[in-house]
């Protein structure tokens, strides 16, 4: 069984005894502590006074031993109390206290050896004193270690508090950062939604513009086709007119040929303008494809869409101008057709009159004198009708009746006047 913790070998080193043998032992111990002359008297020579004195000395020694035992008990209890407190406070100090306990055990063994070897008691006591001093030094060192450990503990506690405060600050900063990240995420999602809506709107606007461009191209192709049909009709009309003019009148053919050449030049210019507009349309289509490629850059795409819209409006205005010019040319063509019809009618009338004159000449051939007069009478309307083509053509604005010197000036003036 394990002995109680408060009972150590140090407490059992010296126990007072009331027996004479115990007194003699204690007397022997006291004689070894400093009174050897009084204890080495033979027992057979002792007197009652000597015995009484020995008893008194024995009592004094017992008191001294009791006091020393009490002091040792107190020190042992103090050491045990200190050891228990240190064991409760710091577990790793058990090694030092274990060394002290081993030292106490060794001292108890030495005390037993002192009981067996009384002649070495003083040396053992001195060694005990030395051991006590060593224990005091160890105690001081242990106290210093405990003080340093307490300082380290306080420092670690202060560091722990600082780390706790820093952790709390970091947690608050992390919460703020997480809130800010959530806000930024929501803003980013809203911005992405707005950008996606803007991109969809721009895509729809681009598709509508492409559809309008396709419609404009279809309208341009339709107008070109109509213009080609008009040109074919014009060429046919011109051929008929040319044939008729060759058969009817040579001088009018030359003047009308010049006018038709001018009309051909106008038609050629209109065709060139159509080709140029077709090139512009192709260029706009390429720009639209480039706009599709650059769709990711929304601000640049928006600016390009504005430019594209302006170009589209300019193209529409140019097409409107071209349509007006085409209408003007068509009106001129209709006017030429009407003039051709009028000339054809006049030629037919003149031919009919000539036939009537010939028949009249054949019927009334004897009176020859009136013939030239009648011939001149019938030729005057023809000559009067032929005289206007001999005159230079008049380039007149149909809107403000401006007289232009040539066809180019008239075209420029008509475009400005229409605008």
Curated annotation (Swiss-Prot):
Phosphoserine PTM positions:
31, 43, 68, 376, 387
Annotated spans, Ubiquitin-binding (UBAN): 242-350
Q: Where does Zn(2+) bind?
A: 397, 400, 413, 417
For region Interaction with CHUK/IKBKB, the annotated ranges are 44-111
User: What organism does the record attribute this protein to?
Assistant: Bos taurus (Bovine)
User: Which InterPro entries does the record associate with it?
Assistant: CC2-LZ_dom, NEMO_N, NEMO_ZF, Optineurin/NFkB_EssMod
The subunit field of the Swiss-Prot or TrEMBL record says: Homodimer; disulfide-linked. Component of the I-kappa-B-kinase (IKK) core complex consisting of CHUK, IKBKB and IKBKG; probably four alpha/CHUK-beta/IKBKB dimers are associated with four gamma/IKBKG subunits. The IKK core complex seems to associate with regulatory or adapter proteins to form a IKK-signalosome holo-complex. The IKK complex associates with TERF2IP/RAP1, leading to promote IKK-mediated phosphorylation of RELA/p65. Part of a complex composed of NCOA2, NCOA3, CHUK/IKKA, IKBKB, IKBKG and CREBBP. Interacts with COPS3, CYLD, NALP2, TRPC4AP and PIDD1.
Per the entry, what this protein does is: Regulatory subunit of the IKK core complex which phosphorylates inhibitors of NF-kappa-B thus leading to the dissociation of the inhibitor/NF-kappa-B complex and ultimately the degradation of the inhibitor. Its binding to scaffolding polyubiquitin plays a key role in IKK activation by multiple signaling receptor pathways. Can recognize and bind both 'Lys-63'-linked and linear polyubiquitin upon cell stimulation, with a much highr affinity for linear polyubiquitin. Could be implicated in NF-kappa-B-mediated protection from cytokine toxicity. Essential for viral activation of IRF3.
Q: Where is this region: Leucine-zipper?
A: 322-343
> Gene3D superfamilies attached here?
L1 transposable element, trimerization domain, Nemo cc2-lz domain - 1d5 darpin complex
Record protein name field: NF-kappa-B essential modulator
Q: Where is this region: Disordered?
A: 1-48, 356-394
The GO terms describing molecular function are: K63-linked polyubiquitin modification-dependent protein binding; linear polyubiquitin binding; protein heterodimerization activity; protein homodimerization activity; zinc ion binding
Q: Where are the zinc fingers (CCHC NOA-type)?
A: 389-419
| Stretches for region Interaction with CYLD | 382-419
